[in-house]
């Protein structure tokens, strides 16, 4: 297993533990479709959250928040739409969030990254 993959998996583990501590329940992890991958799909109350997890060892290259590009955001949005369609989830409240982890700092939960 490559180092980046191991770090990404550790970041997802930390993000999931954080979200669970906030009352979220895991529905799916590393969900794939033709449009891309959704790192975590969780339920928080009556809302489904589609979560992009970003991990960086440090703030080099502008930090972790800068790593979600417009093209990545578009892929995430298309993946979310496909997930909802495939699971016949209509009129279900949902949101696209991110959990950002930099080094040993506590995770930062950014809600509604689509604005």
UniProtKB/Swiss-Prot annotation:
GO molecular function terms listed in the Swiss-Prot or TrEMBL record: nucleic acid binding
Top-level division of the source organism's lineage: Bacteria
A Pfam family assignment: UPF0102
Stretches that traverse the bilayer: none
Record-linked HAMAP family: UPF0102
Family the entry assigns: Belongs to the UPF0102 family.
Designated name of the protein: UPF0102 protein NMCC_2054
Species in which this protein is naturally found: Neisseria meningitidis serogroup C (strain 053442)
Upper lineage: Bacteria, Pseudomonadati, Pseudomonadota, Betaproteobacteria, Neisseriales
């Amino acid at each position: 297993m490559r180092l980046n993959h191991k770090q990404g998996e550790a970041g997802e583990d930390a993000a999931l533990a954080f979200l669970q501590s906030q009352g979220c329940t895991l529905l799916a992890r590393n969900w794939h479709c033709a449009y891309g991958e959704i790192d975590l799909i969780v339920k928080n109350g009556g809302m489904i959250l589609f979560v992009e997890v970003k991990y960086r060892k440090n703030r080099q290259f502008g930090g972790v928040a800068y790593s979600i590009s417009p093209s990545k955001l578009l892929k995430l949005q298309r993946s979310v739409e496909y997930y909802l369609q495939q699971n016949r989830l209509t009129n279900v409240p949902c949101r696209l969030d991110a959990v950002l982890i930099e080094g040993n700092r506590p995770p930062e939960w950014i809600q509604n990254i689509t604005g």
